[in-house]
Amino acid sequence: MIAFLKGAVFERRPDSIIIDVNGVGYEVNIHSRLFPRLPQRGEPILIHTFLQVLENEFKLFGFLDQDELRLFKTLLTVSGIGSKGALAVLSTMEPLVFYRAIASQDEKTLVRIPGVGKKTAQRMIFELQDKVPELKLVEVEKEQRPLLDELMEALEILGYSRSEVLPAIMDLNRNKQLGNIVEENIKLVLKAKAQEMRR
């Protein structure tokens, strides 16, 4: 599994980028919203990747942040949505906008995505409504999201899944018990989980 590539931009296109990693050029498929944010030719880049293994070929897909990579992987679990459809979603809207549309069952927003009709929009809502932990973050204030994301990533490193810790994090955040120090927040989350298990 290729988790990321770190190198220099060799060539940029609206739908792909070639990255020079120690003299080896990797072609990485991207969504169109990513293109304007790419570094220029010869500049350094670190890109998070997903490797898709098909019958006759390997395809790399690249993202500048983990949120977009997570959404891409999640979309691949929806019936009838392949890599092309997942890239179409990310080309059309940011992850938070998509999650908000799923959470509010907003078909009108979803059918703006190229290739997504009413039935596909309904299928996305049905299949993702209960299994995407990020939906609970939709109503979180924008300035709080980096803190919560950092906390969740730290807990993932400790071996906890997002779905396992997100309810406790959201409860603590709702009650304004979380501070700005990640280590202290981890202790609060683990304490809350321990109390929950004793109930």
From Swiss-Prot:
Coiled coil: none annotated. Residues 65-143 are annotated as: Domain II. Residues 144-148 are annotated as: Flexible linker. Residues 1-64 are annotated as: Domain I. GO terms for molecular function: ATP binding; four-way junction DNA binding; four-way junction helicase activity. GO terms for cellular component: cytoplasm; Holliday junction helicase complex; Holliday junction resolvase complex. Transmembrane segments: none annotated. It is found in: Cytoplasm. InterPro entries: DNA_helicase_Holl-junc_RuvA_I, Hlx-hairpin-Hlx_DNA-bd_motif, NA-bd_OB-fold, RuvA, RuvA_2-like, RuvA_C. The RuvA-RuvB-RuvC complex processes Holliday junction (HJ) DNA during genetic recombination and DNA repair, while the RuvA-RuvB complex plays an important role in the rescue of blocked DNA replication forks via replication fork reversal (RFR). RuvA specifically binds to HJ cruciform DNA, conferring on it an open structure. The RuvB hexamer acts as an ATP-dependent pump, pulling dsDNA into and through the RuvAB complex. HJ branch migration allows RuvC to scan DNA until it finds its consensus sequence, where it cleaves and resolves the cruciform DNA. This is Holliday junction branch migration complex subunit RuvA. It comes from Syntrophomonas wolfei subsp. wolfei (strain DSM 2245B / Goettingen).
